[in-house]
Amino acid sequence: MDIRLHHLSIGYRRGPVVARDINITILGGRLTCLIGDNGIGKSTLLRTLSGFQPKVGGEIWLGSREADSLSQRERSRIISIVLTQRPEMGGLTVHDLVGMGRSPYTGFWGNLAARDELAVRQSLVETGAWPLRDRKIDSLSDGERQKVMIARALAQETPIILLDEPTAFLDFHSRIDTLRLLSRLAHTMDKTILLSTHDLQLAAELADLLLLLSPDGLRPVDPATISQDIRQRIQD
């Protein structure tokens, strides 16, 4: 499912506009990485796309639907999001946490039906987290925990997955594994995956597209043409 942005402005209604007049199409079946200076508004854009924060102006189209026409439940069946903040859910097992991804279909406290259990199992298998299914969340490494959070998003069965700095807190090998996993899911499961990152080198190697966010908008960039100044600011 494509994401189409028409003259989108993001920011705060009673505060500054972070970026304005964004016009771009983010294609399905691809891993797209969002880059830009610290504090430029990458998280704001992701929150706006997910519906957690209202837009300032313009339009967001998710496939053939304008986002404003969607109910919260409809949107939760189109977009799943993995945030930077690590949830304090140490008492839950991996299976229980991934099962929470089914809440758009069961309700937050709903019991998992056979179809839901199948979605949980498939998500754990696809992400390589199946061996962790009976572990407590607080026993996991940062890399394992991120894999489980991606599995929860996958269990939500949405065509679009947004991730805010998914490689933060991870060691180098886990960062590689995480981006490779997301690339594979985008290509093999036809997911539209958009993530923010400061890890420009890995993003340039593994992403299908880099998008540079600035106050002037959002534009695709060729990693080979990014100036050293931009590279330094993004990676600091």
Predicted features along the sequence, with ranges:
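Conserved beta-strand-loop-alpha-helix hinge in the C-terminal portion
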Residues: 213-236
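Conserved ABC transporter NBD signature motif
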Residues: 58-66, 75
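Conserved ABC ATPase signature
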Residues: 136-140
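Helix-to-loop junction immediately C-terminal to a conserved catalytic motif
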Residues: 50
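A short, flexible loop at the N-terminus of ABC-type nucleotide-binding domains that lies
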Residues: 1-2, 9-21, 89
